[in-house]
Amino acid sequence: DRTPALRLRF
């Protein structure tokens, strides 16, 4: 998990 938003893809 890199960021709360990007964790949906990455």
From Swiss-Prot:
Similarity section: Belongs to the FARP (FMRFamide related peptide) family.
Keyword DNA-binding tagged: no
Residues the record lists as Phenylalanine amide modifications: F10
GO biological process: neuropeptide signaling pathway
Keywords from the named record: Amidation, Neuropeptide, Secreted
Location within or outside the cell: Secreted
Species this chain originates from: Macrobrachium rosenbergii
Primary location class: secreted
Protein name: FMRFamide-like neuropeptide FLP5
GO cellular component entries: extracellular region
